[in-house]
From Swiss-Prot:
BP terms from Gene Ontology: alkanesulfonate catabolic process; nitrogen utilization; uracil catabolic process
Keyword hit for NADP: yes
Classification via NCBIfam families: RutA
Species this protein is from: Klebsiella variicola (strain At-22)
Name of this protein: Pyrimidine monooxygenase RutA
Xref: InterPro entries: Luciferase-like_dom, Luciferase-like_sf, Pyrimidine_monooxygenase_RutA, SsuD_RutA_monooxygenase
EC number per UniProt: 1.14.99.46
Amino acid sequence: MKIGVFVPIGNNGWLISTHAPQYMPTFELNKAIVQKAEHYHFDFALSMIKLRGFGGKTEFWDHNLESFTLMAGLAAVTSKIQIYATAATLTLPPAIVARMASTIDSISGGRFGVNLVTGWQKPEYDQMGMWPGDDYFASRYDYLTEYVQVLRDLWGTGRSDFKGDYFTMNDCRVSPRPSQPMKVICAGQSDAGMAFSAQHADYNFCFGKGVNTPTAFAPTAARMMQAAEKTGRDVGSYVLFMVIADETDEAARAKWEHYKAGADEEALAWLTEQSQKDTRSGSDTNVRQMADPTSAVNINMGTLVGSYASVARMLDEVASVPGTDGVLLTFDDFLAGIDAFGERIQPLMRCRDHIAPVTREVA
């Protein structure tokens, strides 16, 4: 099972809590995180894109770096780890994304891929006059289908004459082309999102579910496998989890309860409000899971809370779920968390026993 890190491109990472570590996103922080991840043989690093935050006492995600420029910088200071940036497709023409991706492919020596998102938070785009109207919720995967067709044309042949409802290419050119086939990943959990991933993506991200229920996402992975069977393609699932680990189960649980007790209710109310704007995509979208009150303090990603041994055991359970190709990890404290993962958790994982033990780098 592959291991990735979901780098904190926005302030405070993924904990919407006054009790969680409070920090701003910087290149130096993300550089340290990804270089540590590479040192411990993580397979990939991904950054999201967020153009407007949730506010509240913690100003959650009100402060964000930009994904492609961040990952270009990280590509230049790493040598092995795969690097993925996220394209907010409403804001960037596909021909520009194709050229940016080809550039970072050159910087990274063929280690780059692109995560495509349709956009779900209207204020992110409305603030720039770029929201196409609420009918977009129902047509966004039609838009994305044309978008990825243009990308594949340009990456594959260097030229596109695509004509569609959303994009018109007139002998559009991109050169140099990527040195390797460009990986495309998506994060669809709705039926439309999974159908898109089955047709066009190499991997599909999904949320883990619950606290210490590592296989609860299995029905989602099964749906992705079923969708891929219809297209005759192999599209594995990468599952999002937060790791909160310590020497003992009790110590880790105490940290988790402390974070929950400091939940930023104002920021969470904003998330809930935005999740209700899309009435077209069904009840199984990513944003609706994010806003579920069960564990909204970390946007309801699957949460693994326990001793290093307990977390290792639960990650092995994740790996046992059919259709699972990897996990995308966040941490309550990224720098300490990655060190603990590399030194204390990964060596105990059966699914990572091919990785030689690594000790902490000397600064």
